[in-house]
């Protein structure tokens, strides 16, 4: 990004920030909780950018003063040396701020701030694939806990020997999609299953879909398009059986999407959850269709959300996780314990690099 464009965008961001502050002081805004929350969130997003811009301006002023001091110190070798040291340090700070501000101004995915529905499906590998799906679920639950997000299972199909055939987690919090979107795809594990008596390594897979929560305005569902039935939910018997039909089986006829929800205590809650899941699935389809219309260069970027893309291999024997999009290895045990910051941070950095390259090509054109 050339300097004039950078400064122009920073000035626009600062103007927007001050405008948002004025709106927050408006009594009409204060009386509208939804609008107030939206404005406050956008102000919080812009605040670090505005602060960094102020730091950049201060560093630029200090650099000019250091240059003047250097020019005035040509007859004083010691003073000139000190002035040059200060200028060198300011140049480093200036470059770091320019890089940080440029990254902050890159095009944002408007969905990044959203909570998500995280769907994990067992793939190839039979019972071991179901166990692997359960391991992935625990990995995401631990990572979400580290990030301060709230995780709740909203739909689950448990396997006989443990784990899940399919599991959907609701992950709510700040900027959840901006980080978890990189998890969409096929996760392959190579390990000796607990059920393997010969000690042979098996390969199993699970597929992860990351669906940003959709607003009812974005995805409108006609009641006439729905088939809804209810059933009892619970365990194999005894006190675990729910004698009231609280489970909801929902079918969306136009898309063929079916959602079965049993996790909530009441039929109404399960119906609301089922509608949330359906809305997220329909929204994901809309996004997939939009992505398919974009250029191959865009689809090649990290984090496109393609659930068929083989993104990672988890090798237990070598205690190694390989992210195939990055061509990088990470230590397996910490990742499975939810310490995913390095992996996701590398994905974010790669996404930023791709955006910078695209921005550079646009500037050249």
Curated annotation (Swiss-Prot):
Major place of residence: cytoplasm
Protein's cellular compartments: Cytoplasm
Entries under InterPro entries matching the protein: PCRF, Pep_chain_release_fac_I, Pep_chain_release_fac_I_sf, Prokaryotic/Mito_RF, RF-1
Pfam families: PCRF (PF03462), RF-1 (PF00472)
Keywords, comma-separated and alphabetical: Cytoplasm, Methylation, Protein biosynthesis
Family, as annotated: Belongs to the prokaryotic/mitochondrial release factor family.
Protein name: Peptide chain release factor 1
Organism: Synechococcus sp. (strain WH7803)
């Amino acid at each position: 990004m050339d300097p004039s464009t950078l400064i122009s965008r920073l000035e626009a961001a600062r103007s927007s920030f001050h405008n948002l502050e004025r709106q927050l002081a408006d009594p009409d805004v204060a009386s509208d909780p939804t609008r107030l929350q939206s404005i406050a969130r956008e102000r919080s997003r812009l605040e670090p950018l505005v602060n960094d811009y102020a730091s950049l301006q201060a560093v630029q002023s200090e650099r000019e003063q250091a240059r003047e001091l250097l020019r005035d110190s040509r007859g004083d070798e010691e003073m000139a040396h000190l002035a040059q040291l200060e200028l060198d340090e300011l140049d480093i700070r200036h470059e770091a701020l320019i890089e940080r501000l440029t990254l902050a101004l890159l095009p944002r995915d408007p969905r990044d701030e959203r909570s998500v529905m995280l769907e994990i499906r067992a793939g190839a590998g039979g019972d071991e694939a179901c166990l692997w799906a359960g391991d992935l679920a625990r990995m995401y639950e631990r990572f979400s806990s580290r990030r301060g997000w709230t995780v709740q299972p909203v739909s689950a199909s448990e396997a006989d020997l443990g784990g899940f055939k399919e599991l959907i987690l609701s992950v709510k919090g700040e900027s959840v999609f901006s980080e978890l979107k990189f998890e969409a795809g096929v996760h392959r594990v190579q390990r000796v299953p607990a059920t393997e008596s010969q000690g042979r390594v098996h390969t199993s897979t699970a597929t992860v879909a990351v669906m940003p929560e959709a607003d009812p305005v974005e995805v409108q569902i006609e009641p006439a398009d729905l088939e809804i039935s209810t059933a009892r939910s619970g365990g194999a018997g005894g006190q675990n059986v729910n004698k009231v039909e609280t489970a909801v089986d929902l079918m969306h006829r136009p898309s063929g999407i079916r959602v079965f929800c049993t996790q909530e205590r009441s039929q109404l809650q399960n119906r609301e959850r089922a509608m949330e899941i359906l809305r997220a699935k329909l929204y994901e389809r809309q996004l997939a269709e939009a992505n398919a219309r974009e250029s191959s260069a865009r689809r090649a970027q990290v984090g496109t959300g393609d659930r068929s893309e083989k993104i990672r291999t988890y090798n237990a024997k070598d205690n190694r996780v390989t992210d195939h999009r990055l061509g990088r290895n990470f230590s397996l045990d910490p990742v499975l314990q939810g310490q995913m910051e390095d992996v996701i941070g590398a994905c974010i950095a790669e996404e930023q690099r791709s955006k910078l390259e695209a921005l550079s090509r646009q500037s050249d054109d």
